[in-house]
Structures are given as C-alpha cells and as structure tokens.
C-alpha cells in the first residue's frame, strides 16, 4: 500500500485553487458512500514521486493533517479521477474515493499483457484494445492488475472479455464479446491470402473446361 500525506484545505474556490498551484500544491477532495467530502491539498513534489507507481486500483493510505501538522484522519482510498491542464498536462486536481466495507465499487484495473504471440512471429502485430479493464469488486478484493497471456495467439486470433481470468468476486463490466487484445493480420498478408484463395477457387473451373473441350 502506498502512503501519501495531505493537509486539510480550509479555504475553497477557484481563486484559492489557483493560489495553491502557484505554491506547488495540488487541490484534491476525498469522498465516498459514507464519507462527507473533505477538501485537502497535497505537495506536488511528494505527489510526483509516487504518481508513476500508482493506478486507479492501487490502495493508498492517505494521512490527513491540519496546518499545524497534527494527524486528523487516516483513510484507505483509491485514486478516482485526475484532472490535468489542457495545455501543460500537469495535474490540477485529484479525487480520492474512500470505499465502505460491504459496498461494491467500480474501478479500472490495468491490463498486463505477457508473452509474445506466434502470430507476431508470422508478421502480424498485437493490438491492445483495452489497457484498463473496468470491474466491479469488493474494496478488499481489488486486483492490482489483470494478466492475459497472448503467447498462443495466431494471426487473426482474439481474446474477448469473457476469456479473462478474474479473481473470485471480481466482475468484468465489459460485454462478453468485447475484444480485449488481438493479433491483426497485416494488409499485404491479407491480400496475399485472398489472392491465393481466388486462384484455388478458379483452378477446378479451368480443369473442367479443358475436360469438356477434349470430349
């Protein structure tokens, strides 16, 4: 579990949010089914150290302190939403979700692709349609990642949502027929195969005509 420190944000509003960002802090809010929204602020320098290591499925121990440095609350939360500046792409606001025991939650879990498909060895290329899988689960059963082995995939093969192996109690929210990963056939290979099929289909007709002429 990742640990992150936040400070209570006493003053709210857009003007205050801009002031915080200029000071190197990121405004955020904590909420949940049984949690009243708590406005907080986090040092950008602290956030940047862990941001590349967490996903929406990573449980975070959020230590909330007041301006004097006294701990007022410790909560297990998940990163629910990240707002970024449209131009600079820097993080401007965060939403943290505190689940309640017995209350199922919807969350996106990273997809981990392992292995090299046999179809890639034949000139195909692997297409990943979903880098994250939306699931419904109990808070204490959130998987850190969903692994899918693509080693046996040949040209044109597809792994659908129904093929994913999920832990007990975790439900995939994609349609069963939804494609997750596939080995796509390169255009030139597809044209070659189509030409060969046409030639094979035409061959018996040519032979038949020859036989008729000989008669």
Swiss-Prot record:
The keyword Signal does not apply. Residues 205-215 have a biased composition (Basic and acidic residues). One of its GO terms (molecular function) is structural constituent of ribosome. It comes from the Bacteria. Keywords: Ribonucleoprotein, Ribosomal protein, RNA-binding, rRNA-binding. One of its GO terms (biological process) is translation. Residues 192-215 are annotated as: Disordered. GO terms for cellular component: cytosolic large ribosomal subunit. Residues 192-203 have a biased composition (Acidic residues). SUPFAM superfamilies: Ribosomal protein L25-like. This is one of the proteins that binds to the 5S RNA in the ribosome where it forms part of the central protuberance. Part of the 50S ribosomal subunit; part of the 5S rRNA/L5/L18/L25 subcomplex. Contacts the 5S rRNA. Binds to the 5S rRNA independently of L5 and L18. HAMAP family: Ribosomal_bL25_CTC. Belongs to the bacterial ribosomal protein bL25 family. CTC subfamily. This is Large ribosomal subunit protein bL25. It comes from Thermotoga maritima (strain ATCC 43589 / DSM 3109 / JCM 10099 / NBRC 100826 / MSB8). The gene is rplY.
